[in-house]
Amino acid sequence: MHKPVKNVVILPADYGQDTARRWPVVYLLHGFRGRYDTWIGKTQPGLPEAASRTGEVIVCPDGGYSSWYWDSPTDPSMRYETYVAEELVAAIDSLYRTRNGRGGRAITGYSMGGHGALYLALRHPETFGACGSMSGGVELCPFPKNWDIEKRLGPYRDNPQRWEEYSVMGQLWRAVPFNDRSREVAGLPAQDPSSELQPGQLAIFIDCGTEDYFYAVNLRLHEELLYRNVPHEFIVRPGRHTHDYWRHAVEYHLLFFRDFFAREIQPQ
């Protein structure tokens, strides 16, 4: 993008004690109007302690205020899919002692970041082995005038297929088509079946509060995952679209990822 992008990197307290040890990494994405330090400065200041408890390096990238973590088809200055899923991952693996394979990487986030985490994981399962979403904006079409989406994709009325394609739901239909007809209805091109998501390839964790304005689209995503026999965990709790909700939710996500990372290092 030809510009500096800031990130917060949180290391477990004992990172420096065993120089032979390699650590799994969790990429933690902020929501609309957030920035690289929103997670540690506002949402969950206890992330350093959490990283030490779970034994995970936590990386909080800047998502460009309202990038939705896309490579925008209308704004070349917004290429956050490439930045997070390729450039940042490569930089973190080169600078820190990481487990630099998909079995050592997870990605999650809240709101816009929940969308971004699932979107990137579905598009880059070779990079991320686990993913999550807290109150994620996983379907875009019901919100044609909100959160700068129109700036990134163009007006919905002019680009309905693009809005579908750039949503988590559209990426699910692409990655796990129920049949050829579902791909046709989604307006998605045919692809090599070998590129489709395999059962259990991604460990997926989704949660949303029952009073959240994204609750209905998260419930629909859960139902679509069930319909396509995609294993996942889905948690519903009382709560709204607030930092207080995500402060508690992130603890569950980090534990889910800890268990995933532990399974990945067990002898087969």
Question: What name fits each language-model region?
Answer:
Residues 1-268:
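Non-catalytic cap/lid and distal C-terminal segments of serine-dependent acyl enzymes
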